[in-house]
Curated annotation (Swiss-Prot):
This is Probable xyloglucan endotransglucosylase/hydrolase protein 11. It comes from Arabidopsis thaliana. The lineage of its organism: Eukaryota, Viridiplantae, Streptophyta, Embryophyta, Tracheophyta. Its EC number is 2.4.1.207. Glycans are attached at residues 50, 194. It is found in: Secreted, Cell wall; Secreted, Extracellular space, Apoplast. Residues 32-209 form the GH16 domain. The active site is at residue 107. GO terms for molecular function: hydrolase activity, hydrolyzing O-glycosyl compounds; polysaccharide binding; xyloglucan:xyloglucosyl transferase activity.
Amino acid sequence: MRGSDQKILLMVMVVVAVVAAAQGQEETTGFVTWGNNYYQTWGHQALVINKTSELQLTLDKNSGSGFESQLIYGSGYFNVRIKAPQTTSTGVITSFYLISRSSRHDELCFQILGKNGPPYLLNTNMYLYGEGGKDQRFRLWFDPTKDYHSYSFLWNPNQLVFYVDDTPIRVYSKNPDVYYPSVQTMFLMGSVQNGSIIDPKQMPYIAKFQASKIEGCKTEFMGIDKCTDPKFWWNRKQLSSKEKTLYLNARKTYLDYDYCSDRQRYPKVPQECGSYT
C-alpha cells in the first residue's frame, strides 16, 4: 500500500472512531421496545405481546422471572409502566430496578408488594456502594392490579428522584459528606418473584410491563464522567414548584415507613438521611 493510501486509510479509521465515540454520548430517547433493549435473564420465557410494546413475566410454583436491559447508562430518566398481578397476591413482589454490576453496587428499586386487596404498599429501597436497608414504604393511592401506572427514576449528578405517575415520592440529593451514586454505570432490571409464602391456588401470577420511556446517557464508548454533561436535559432537571407540592403531600399522606425514623433498627440516624429533601 502506498504511503498516501495509508494516510487516507488512517484518516478514515480516525473518523470512524470519533463517530463511534460521539454515538456513545448520544442519548437514548423515546419509547424503547422490549426486543430492542431488553432480554430475559432468568425464570420462565417472557411473553412479548402487542407488537413488542408489552412484556409479561410469570410466577408459578416452579419459578418467577426477570429481565434486564442490554444498554448501560451513566445518568438519565428511566420510566416503565407496570400492571401488578391479580388482586389476591399476598407474598408476590413485582420490581423495577436501576442497578450496577459490582460487589459494592448502587441500586434504586421499586417493589410493589402483593396483598389480598387495597391499600397496596410500594416499597422503595436504595443501595449506596453495597450498603442497603434504606427502605421507604408508601401506601399507594390507587390499585396497581387494575391498570398500568408509571414508575420512574431520575438520576443526575445532583439528585435521585423516585416518581409514581409523575408524583415525586422520594428525593436523595448529593451531599459532599456522604456517598452519592456517580461512579458506577447502571442498567435496568425487572422481575416478579415470591417474597414469602404465596397461594398456589392463585397461580400463575402475571406481571405486565409496558414499553418504557428511556432518556439516558449510554456508556458503551465512554466513561461515566461524560454523562454529567449539562447538555442532557435530565442533568439540569430540578423539581418544579408543582412537583415540590406533590412531593410534600405524598410524604405527608402516603408515607408508611421510613428507615431514617426507625430507632429500633437504627439507634443512630444513618448519615445519608440528611441528604433527603
